[in-house]
């Protein structure tokens, strides 16, 4: 520790700072909703849905209660359930796999690429050639840390095998793959608005996006008990509605998302430059994609020691994620994997560390973080 803890803590993420940055506009939006008296769905949600659909470049956006529900609704709308296989990754938030199991389907876990930590297309290709009990139904890649997965190859594999492609975009708001937004490639894109996301609510929220009118209609029904008309269920659905206050807040914040993502990218550039000479692995950026740096993740063998060092200096870090889904107690020993196993995933979980990154991170804060990391290596080299 260089001795700068007295300067005040630097959190790994700071949702309050994001609110303060837009407080007048957010407060006005909240007041408008409160005074209007409509708090579930309604005009505010419809307005945000239209704005978000335009942002992603799709015809339809349907608000829901969370990113987890977004994946569940997507699977249900695609008629995926018991006896079906969904190919996804273990290096993800558990919500990805939990949603698959909530519809009764079975997750088949594919290893990730060592540089991007997104689904490895060659591993998916091998897994699709292995005979299995159950019907292969969908590929569900995760655009992790703000980095798009290798969508061209994944889309080709899904199409060639007659599978749905459902994108987990919980961490990739505004990320581009070959110039197109994530969420616009698959049958359905699934977004989370958890407060720490690049586009975060002041509570929970989610969104499913689709270009198919039929899928959009099914999603709208299923998010509200399967209602086609009030109190009459045309299909089995769930209760997963985006509330009006969160929609109003999110529409305000959507207006600054491009600038916020640009700031995240600038912070990542500073880290890249300041840490380049050190014996650690920096994030890899796809040449044909735009990374929006939901997380800035470094990798090193001394991960835990560096984390302790930064904590002592008042600098917060995270591990995304410390235990792969297939090794967590609730799932250990009962999830299938691709033929090569999950070695890349398991090694990454032991070595990755997420540094502070959010739009309000100041240049002085960035300097301090870089200085502390350099100090760690000077001390222990």
Label every PLM stretch briefly.
Residues 2-3, 16, 45-50, 55-61, ...:
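PLP-dependent aminotransferase class I/II
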Residues 37-85, 91, 99-103, 109-111, ...:
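Phosphate-binding glycine-rich loop
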Residues 103, 160-161, 313:
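Helix C-cap/helix->beta junction micro-motif
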Residues 106-116, 318:
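Short beta-strand->loop structural element characteristic of the AMP-binding/adenylate-forming
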Residues 115-201, 209, 354:
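Active-site phosphate-binding strand-loop segment of PLP-dependent enzymes
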């Amino acid at each position: 520790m260089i001795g700068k803890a007295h300067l005040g803590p630097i959190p790994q993420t700071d949702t309050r700072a994001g609110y303060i940055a837009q407080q007048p506009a957010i407060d006005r939006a909240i007041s408008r909703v409160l005074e209007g008296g409509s708090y579930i769905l309604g005009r505010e949600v419809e307005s945000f849905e239209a704005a978000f659909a335009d942002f992603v470049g799709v015809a339809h956006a349907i608000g829901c209660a969370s990113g987890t529900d977004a994946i569940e609704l997507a699977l249900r709308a695609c008629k995926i359930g018991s006896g079906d296989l969904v190919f996804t990754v273990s290096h993800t938030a558990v919500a990805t796999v939990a949603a698959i199991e909530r519809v009764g389907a079975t997750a088949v876990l594919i290893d990730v690429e060592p540089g991007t930590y997104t689904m490895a297309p060659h591993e998916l290709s091998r897994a699709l050639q292995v005979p299995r009990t159950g019907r292969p139904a969908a590929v569900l890649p995760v655009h992790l840390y703000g980095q798009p997965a290798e969508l061209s190859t994944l889309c080709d594999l899904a199409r060639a095998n007659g599978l749905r492609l459902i994108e987990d975009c919980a961490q990739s708001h505004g990320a581009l793959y070959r110039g197109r937004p994530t969420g616009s490639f698959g049958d359905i894109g699934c977004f989370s608005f958890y407060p720490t996301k690049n586009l975060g609510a002041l509570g929970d929220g989610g969104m499913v996006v689709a270009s198919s009118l039929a899928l959009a209609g099914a999603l709208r029904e299923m998010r509200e008990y399967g209602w086609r008309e009030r109190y009459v269920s045309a299909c089995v659905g769930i209760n997963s509605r985006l509330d009006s206050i969160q929609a109003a807040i999110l529409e305000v914040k959507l207006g600054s998302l491009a600038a916020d993502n640009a700031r995240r990218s600038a912070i990542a550039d500073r880290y890249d430059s300041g840490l380049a000479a050190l014996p650690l692995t920096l994030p890899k950026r796809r040449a044909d994609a735009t990374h929006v740096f939901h997380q800035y993740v470094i990798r090193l063998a001394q991960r835990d020691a560096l984390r302790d060092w930064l904590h002592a200096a008042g600098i917060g870090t995270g591990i995304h994620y410390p235990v792969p889904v297939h090794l967590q107690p609730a799932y250990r020993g009962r999830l299938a994997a691709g033929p090569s196993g999950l070695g890349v995933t398991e090694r990454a979980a032991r070595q990755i560390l997420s540094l502070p990154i959010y739009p309000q991170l100041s240049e002085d804060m960035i300097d301090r973080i870089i200085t502390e990391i350099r100090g760690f290596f000077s001390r222990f080299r």
